[in-house]
């Protein structure tokens, strides 16, 4: 990544996390999702999608950092987590680089190309 990427996350008009999930766009780079929101325990799951032409350029990491800032400032979220298919080495590396640590393993949890694969859970406790 050359230089720090400044990312602005934008939700669709009228969207809120009160429904349990929220998609935020970082156009033209991609989008991040908060889902499975648990307001009592102040945690949510994270999903991320990066447009193919912007991959491996630091945008995903910048999007995660922007999501973390928004999560603490707007929703008082304490913990973010992601469930990642074990064959997805790029995603595992991204979340590790962002400071997430592995906290669980789910056997035969996801179907990828018609095959069951394990999934790891990675989490980050936000300050």
What are these regions (language model features)?
Residues 95, 100, 122:
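Conserved active-site tyrosine of GNAT-family acetyltransferases
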Residues 115-127:
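Terminal substrate-recognition subdomain of acyl/acetyltransferases
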Residues 50, 56-73, 89-97:
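Conserved acetyl-CoA-binding loop-helix of GNAT-fold acetyltransferases
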Residues 73-83:
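Conserved GNAT acetyl-CoA-binding A-motif
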Residues 81-84, 101-118:
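Conserved catalytic-core motifs of GNAT/GCN5-like acyltransferases
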Residues 1-55, 125-127:
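Acetyl-CoA-dependent GNAT
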């Amino acid at each position: 990544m050359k230089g720090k990427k400044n990312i602005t996350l934008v939700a669709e008009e009228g969207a809120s996390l009160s429904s349990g999930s929220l998609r935020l766009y970082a156009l033209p780079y991609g989008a991040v999702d908060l889902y499975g929101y648990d307001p009592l325990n102040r945690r949510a799951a994270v999903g991320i999608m990066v447009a193919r032409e912007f991959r491996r350029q630091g945008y995903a990491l910048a999007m995660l950092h922007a999501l973390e800032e928004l999560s603490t400032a707007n929703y008082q979220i304490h913990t973010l987590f992601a469930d990642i298919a074990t064959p997805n080495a790029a995603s595992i590396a991204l979340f590790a680089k962002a400071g997430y640590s592995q906290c669980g393993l789910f056997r035969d949890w996801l179907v990828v190309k018609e095959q069951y694969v394990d999934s790891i859970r990675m989490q980050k406790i936000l300050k």
